[in-house]
Amino acid sequence: MQRGIDSFFKRLPAKAKSAEAENGETPSKAPKRRKAVIISSDEDEVVSPPETKKRKASKTASSEDDVVAATPEPIAKKARNGQKPALSKLKRHVDPTELFGGETKRVIVPKPKTKAVLEFENEDIDRSLMEVDLDESIKEAAPEKKVHSITRSSPSPKRAKNSSPEPPKPKSTKSKATTPRVKKEKPAADLESSVLTDEERHERKRASAVLYQKYKNRSSCLNPGSKEIPKGSPDCLSGLTFVVTGVLESMEREEAESVIKEYGGKVMTVVGKKLKYLVVGEEAGPKKLAVAEELNIPILSEDGLFDLIREKSGIAKQVKEEKKSPKKEHSSEEKGKKEVKTSRRSSDKKEKEATKLKYGEKHDIAKHKVKEEHTSPKETKDKLNDVPAVTLKVKKEPSSQKEHPPSPRTADLKTLDVVGMAWVDKHKPTSIKEIVGQAGAASNVTKLMNWLSKWYVNHDGNKKPQRPNPWAKNDDGSFYKAALLSGPPGIGKTTTATLVVKELGFDAVEFNASDTRSKRLLKDEVSTLLSNKSLSGYFTGQGQAVSRKHVLIMDEVDGMAGNEDRGGMQELIALIKDSSIPIICMCNDRNHPKIRSLVNYCYDLRFQRPRLEQIKGKIMSICFKEKVKISPAKVEEIIAATNNDIRQSINHIALLSAKEDASQKSGQQVATKDLKLGPWEVVRKVFTADEHKHMSFADKSDLFFHDYSLAPLFVQQNYLQVLPQGNKKDVLAKVAATADALSLGDLVEKRIRANSAWSLLPTQAFFSSVLPGEHMCGHFTGQINFPGWLGKNSKSGKRARLAQELHDHTRVCTSGSRLSVRLDYAPFLLDNIVRPLAKDGQEGVPAALDVMKDYHLLREDLDSLVELTSWPGKKSPLDAVDGRVKAALTRSYNKEVMAYSYSAQAGIKKKKSEAAGADDDYLDEGPGEEDGAGGHLSSEEDEDKDNLELDSLIKAKKRTTTSKASGGSKKATSSTASKSKAKAKK
């Protein structure tokens, strides 16, 4: 059996040795003793050095006495006599807790005579004792390490030859690392703070309150814009963290933070160990300064920040060189002079070195000759001024240009054309391959080219192509005579059309929004173009024959509106039907009501926005050609701000390049595009959390003003379909807060509409858009719905109107109000009319007619009664009546019931002349001109009464021009006759 661990530590009995002696076994020699040093895991592994002969006698004696004291008396005597005792007699009982760790011995300290100032709990006392023990152990361990370092610093001569002398640096670093831990006395600080009196605490609170009031009432920057912000390299401050405190001299704090972020730095709010620099202005926070001094964080001023940007971007050296050198004008001639001067100086230096090598230092006469040969610096400058203009031009210009130099006027015109052109026109694509986002076999460019190249083959009149299915994907457009290119602006629709026409050799005739495109113009001018021949190739001198191949391009078709373009869309559709040439139409909004009728006659090609990477490559190539340095990240920001608009992105880059001192911050302000968002997109941005990351308060408020009438309705309709971020327990509280905000916004809108207080619109934007978006910030869980309030409001208005009409019609026989008619009369009236029709059929028609006659109801009032009494999910009572019975009721009603005064068919349209009908007799009796005037009015009245057009029950044909002329002649003769009679009486 195996022995237990306790058996190794038990003391052996004395009989064991006697037994061995009796058996005659010789005892084995005691092995040499070795020291085992136990090292804790917390301390460094320090190996004790071997014992040396220089040890003091007192220490050896004391150690020997301890060993002898631990052994029995006979063994101690042998040890004193110099004899080695047996191993078995030296063994003593060992407690396992001493080897494997056990309870620590408690030190009993006498109680203090005076009481402590504060009474601590047991945990606080234990912490303080542990920290004191640690401090003492660290202090005691330090001299031991020094001793070890001294012993190790004297190596053996063999090792000294092989090893290189290295100073014991790791020991010193360890000791240094431990020193700050000793200095930190957190419990002492806690004691001091806890010992503070009430007066001191009050003083601290008062001081902090004063500092907070100073912070609230702090002034802005002292001299805004007085210092120029250095233009550093991008990401020159990457990896550095900053904290800005106080009021700077020429910048606001937010402006300084934005400058740091532009160059790749990170801005923090709290001073900590990870902080690299603290930027300080006036009235800086004292706590931040104290913590920065404690952690040895470098403190910078505003000028120090600018110097750091220059230093990190390598501008400091250039600035020093510019200060040393005098100011010179930056002209092309001086640049050439500098280049030539440097070349001549280098050649002079080479000549000097060659002369030194040839002649050496001994030949003084040769040196004097060389010095005399050199001319004065003024003469060299005059000579050099004449040299560069010839040498540089000769190198650049080829021989052909020398023989036939261009005239200065033509050269100037060409340069002016190139320089004055906008970048959009200067760098527009010249071939189909250069169009952005239109590569591949399935692109719209390929489809348009295929359709246009086969147009004359498909429409030659021999065989009519078959109309394709509206949902066909692989339609090549052979049936259509026109093509419709639709898509957002600035993505290359017009460029695609013009380049495809040019590639196939067609001549284009273009009409855009600046031209009048009315029905008359299209009929007179465009219709003649559809059958004409083109002479453009003949006049341009391209050697082409007169061609019949030309294309009509109608740009911005959705803009054909107003009086100028009245009837233009219908005429364009008629021209497409009978056209003998291809027509290419372009529009931005394909869902426009006018375009829906045009789509049925056109080959539909929808253009999508190019991807950001495609536009980025094009713009970076333009920047390289124009020698404009801009970071790719900045280009991506501009493209995203313009909503992937190629034209506007290029215009923004050109605007940035126009200013040489344009910083990246100014570029951010320029790179904005006002987009017209629909209500669905606005609601999505109001509630989506991802959109809120890059939006300020002003941006959130601007969403409301895209359509301030519909925006609150969309928010109210869809806020319950949003799942907000955060804890699910807070969802109901957020919904309640959103409902309160919407109700307050509705009150503000009521005040705006009632009192025309339009200055309250920003307040309504806060309650109706910003607050609901903040409370319910998350993501949509369903589809965005159209506001149901609009439909319900129109339905309630319609029912109120129908109830008012019923109340007016039945007012002769009833005495109730409009509400009583709707609630009490309407169900029973409808039941009395419909029940005989449903039971008896056509025989019940007279009974139904009697009820309608008694209450003076119209035939349309029956439908109004059905609508007022029916509820959602309830069937109409007229559904049980046969259709033939309904028709019989309508016929009998039209025959028997006379038209009421309020019926739609009754009455004749009145004119203002009828108001003077009562005074006609008096006008006839009056003398003189009044008599003539009265006769004139009476004749007009008679004609109005006889005019059948004014009777609503009779549909008369329009009177011809001849009848109007005859009527006019009669009126003229009667008026002249009356005038002659009046003159005769006089």
Curated annotation (Swiss-Prot):
| Locations listed in the record | Nucleus
Q: At the top level of its lineage, which domain of life is listed?
A: Eukaryota
GO CC, any one term: nucleus
The principal location of this protein is nucleus
* Low complexity composition-biased segments: 962-979
User: One MF term in GO for this entry?
Assistant: ATP hydrolysis activity
One of the GO BP terms on file: DNA replication
Domain annotation BRCT: ranges: 232-322
Instruction: Point out residues bearing the modification Phosphoserine.
Output: 18, 28, 40-41, 48, 58, 62-63, 128, 137, 149, 154, 156, 164, 194, 938-939
Locate the residues binding ATP: 487-494
Positions modified as Phosphothreonine? 60, 71, 197
Q: State the residue spans of region: Disordered.
A: 1-95, 136-203, 317-388, 913-986
Q: Which UniProt keywords apply?
A: Activator, ATP-binding, DNA replication, DNA-binding, Nucleotide-binding, Nucleus, Phosphoprotein, Transcription, Transcription regulation
Task: Find motif (Nuclear localization signal) and give its ranges.
Answer: 955-959
Compositionally biased intervals (Basic and acidic residues): 136-147, 317-364, 370-385
Q: How does it assemble?
A: Interacts with C-terminus of PCNA.
What function does this protein fulfil?
A: The elongation of primed DNA templates by DNA polymerase delta and epsilon requires the action of the accessory proteins proliferating cell nuclear antigen (PCNA) and activator 1. This subunit binds to the primer-template junction.
Tell me which family the UniProt entry assigns to this protein. Answer: Belongs to the activator 1 large subunit family.
What is the protein name stated in its UniProt record? Replication factor C subunit 1
Native species: Drosophila melanogaster (Fruit fly)
Q: What is the lineage of its organism?
A: Eukaryota, Metazoa, Ecdysozoa, Arthropoda, Hexapoda
What gene does this protein come from?
A: Gnf1
